Amino acid sequence: MTARTPAPFTADDYRARMERAARAAADAGLAGLLVAPGPDLVWLTGYAPTAVTERLTLLVLVPGQDPALIVPALEAPDAAKATGAPALTLRDWTDGKDPYAVTAALLETDGRFGISDNAWAMHLLGLAKTLPDSSYASLTEALPMLRAVKDEAELERLAAAGAAADATYEEIRKVPFAGRKESEVAADLARLLREHGHETVDFTIVASGPNGANPHHEAGDRVIERGDMVVLDFGGLLGGYGSDTSRTVHVGEPTDEERRIHDIVREAQEAGFRAVRPGVPCQEVDRAARAVITDAGYGAYFIHRTGHGIGVTTHEPPYMIEGEEQPLVPGMCFSVEPGIYLPGRFGVRIEDIVTVTEDGGRRLNETTREMVIVD
């Protein structure tokens, strides 16, 4: 079985996104946006260069002007194939020409521009030298909501990715665990994600026994034993949108303590989910989940934020973390993933992707959050 891949986006979809981004830039007091290769460029245009090099590629969005993509001439044929290409003007440049001058010709000489967080320093310095009176702001800090609120087509893709992750979990529960290396189970996870439609697999955490106390443990050569708690955290991209799911299974019968801690984490995850509704600050989701774990006496062992946004990448704004006062808005999608990590012993994490609805939240993962016994 493979998850159904939604219909592809159209040039009109990308045109609408670029127009929305340009309006947001103007509302933020910016003269324009300078978007380097990466998630923002993919989201705005559908274009992902096959290789990011020292040659400048940059989307220029200026309110009131047609979008322009500055691109090396040798990359222009591929850029022209991007779904969003009909909605913008390609401005190619050849080796020996100054790409910063090509860019500067489209910009105000003393404007303030939002620039991609992942833009190379050499390109920012080149622009600053060419436009010495200009200034720059982090695109993410200036426009934190640019990709945070998903439309129906994006939600459909995230739901498909979540369904594929659910199907993967249902099947991984059936494979042998005891006597196999973590890396072997991780390979099973990757294979199943691909079988269920993922074009990329970004991570397959299999953290058994004491390794489970490390939230970002990389699956290795440890042989899984009977009596182990095993944290599974896996995801990637399907149809260009992310999945990210965590469940914790037990090899054989768990102890009373292991069941109790799993129940605490499950209750914390449920509390975080129940806190999701429009207008609630992001930090309240973190507080709700964290309170359950703290009240149970394990607050010191919950060592990360409760959640992160997801979309064309598996980690992006908004973040469910103390101090984040951004109100939740219908269409936002993010993880709710509390955990307890006991050093040298074991860990437990339960994670679903949740979307904000008009009257609360909706899970995009439907597999059981109860303790599952595996062989």
Where are these regions (language model features)?
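Active-site neighborhoods and metal-handling regions in enzymes and metal-associated proteins
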Residues: 1-375
